[in-house]
A protein has these predicted regions:
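A compositional/structural signature for long, glycine/proline-rich flexible linkers
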Residues: 2-6, 10-196
Length: 196
């Protein structure tokens, strides 16, 4: 597996650049609006630009914090215990599941993801840079049989290996949020075996 280590300073620099670009784009819309458009049209366009760009900036900040503090890009992290009150990685964490998290970069090619067969409830959601769910693996969509999946970015054009299902991300960066049902702390070992 290829991993990419990003230093916290590089993350901060990328986030500053993203915020600067978003601000510059909004300023450009406002200046152009003052010259060519009515005030109402200018406000509407600025609002649309903000609504469009804000999720990308927030997602990148979330990614930068994760890779600076928990794990590098392309590394799956398993949370071994229930979250306590200090847990801030997800807005409202579940208190009956253990999490598996990763930020995946498909710039250098696709990734293989294997979901083991299990009767236990588990869901693996894949989100794009706008935080839209583009794939959700679990009992509702794949049943309990598990499977092998090829996660590819928007421009990948290779052959999907036999026995694998293609999951196409609309963006080069994807966020994996996995949850496995846990029946109390005494059940941790069984969940850890599934996460492995």
């Amino acid at each position: 597996m290829t991993t990419l280590d990003i230093a916290p300073a590089a993350c901060a620099q990328q986030c500053r650049l993203g915020r600067w670009l978003l601000g510059a784009g909004l300023l450009l819309v406002l200046v152009a609006g003052a010259l060519l458009l009515s005030q109402r049209e200018t406000i509407r366009l600025a609002a649309q630009g903000y609504v469009f760009g804000y999720p990308l900036v927030i997602t990148d900040l979330t990614r930068a914090n994760f890779v600076a503090g928990m794990a590098p890009t392309n590394r799956l992290v398993h949370v071994p215990a229930f979250p306590d009150a200090r847990f801030r990685d997800i807005v409202r964490p579940n208190v009956d599941t253990l999490y598996s998290l990763a930020w995946l970069d498909m710039n250098d090619g696709p990734w293989v993801f294997e979901l083991p067969a299990s009767e236990r409830y588990a869901v693996m959601q894949f989100l794009d840079a706008w935080t839209n769910v583009f794939a959700s693996l679990g009992p509702r969509t794949t049943g309990t049989r598990g499977g092998r999946f090829l996660l590819a970015g928007p421009h990948w054009q290779g052959q999907v290996p036999e026995g694998m299902t293609l999951l196409r991300s609309p963006t080069r960066i994807a966020w994996l949020l996995g949850r496995v049902q846990t029946n109390g702390k005494a059940d941790y070992m069984a969940v850890h075996a599934i996460q492995a």
